[in-house]
Amino acid sequence: MAWSPLLLTLLAHCTGSWAQSVLTQPPSVSGAPGQRVTISCTGSSSNIGAGYDVHWYQQLPGTAPKLLIYGNSNRPSGVPDRFSGSKSGTSASLAITGLQAEDEADYYCQSYDSSLSG
């Protein structure tokens, strides 16, 4: 049986007039089952580069977002160790090893931004 590549769709959703997108993610990342994929999150000196933590969320179709990684690289209880997070400079990344069909979802990165306070 031939496997079709999985498509991990990354969407930037903003709601409300106050919302501003300050972190950049690729529109999509794809990989075959069993492979390792990395999702990037690029920020600036006012958020990731300022030392603020990065958090990652996974949203499966028809469900609310679920916390996947907190504090750059920590996994909540119940999250498989196939998921890992890292941060360097003004960017962060989420790695998924041993990609599985159930990993097809939307993934979001989040961080505090000092330029938006006030």
Curated annotation (Swiss-Prot):
GO CC annotation: extracellular region; immunoglobulin complex; plasma membrane
Chain residue ranges for the region called Complementarity-determining-3: 110-118
Start and end residues of each Ig-like domain: 20-118
Cysteines joined through disulfide linkages: C41-C109
Top-rank taxon: Eukaryota
Region annotated Complementarity-determining-2, chain positions: 71-73
GO biological process, alphabetically ordered: adaptive immune response; immune response
A family per Pfam: V-set
Region span, Framework-3: 74-109
Region (Framework-2): 54-70
Any one GO molecular function term: antigen binding
Record keywords: Adaptive immunity, Cell membrane, Disulfide bond, Immunity, Immunoglobulin, Immunoglobulin domain, Membrane, Pyrrolidone carboxylic acid, Secreted, Signal
Cellular localization per UniProt: Secreted; Cell membrane
Keyword Ubl conjugation: no
Keyword Cell membrane applies: yes
Region (Complementarity-determining-1): 45-53
Signal peptide: 1-19
Subunit structure: Immunoglobulins are composed of two identical heavy chains and two identical light chains; disulfide-linked.
Protein name, per record: Immunoglobulin lambda variable 1-40
Organism expressing this protein natively: Homo sapiens (Human)
